[in-house]
Amino acid sequence: MQIEVKGRNCPVTPEIRQRVERRFEKVAKQVSDLARLEVELCEERNPANPDAQVAEATLELKGTTLRAREATRDMEHSINLVADELARQVKRHRDKRRARRDARAPLGVQPGL
């Protein structure tokens, strides 16, 4: 899986990049190698907003796009939450595809006989 980490209003240090790659390993194991993950980390500059550390993840799969966004006071916590949310979405998507595939009748069976 290809992982791209971007920063908006905050620098992306090698430590943050490693943390993102480590947290999204669970997602990488569930999807194909052709999948593309874009993680955008930003710091909102609004004094009225206490949850200024935002992590957004966009996962492009074959035929679909999954997106998750989390905002907290700590960037590390935001990364953890968005990784967990995206892992849940990938599992749900995979289970739905499997259920649809299994619900189809086999080719050798004719309905009504």
What are these regions (language model features)?
Residues 1-113:
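N-terminal, polar/charged subdomain of small-to-medium soluble alpha/beta proteins
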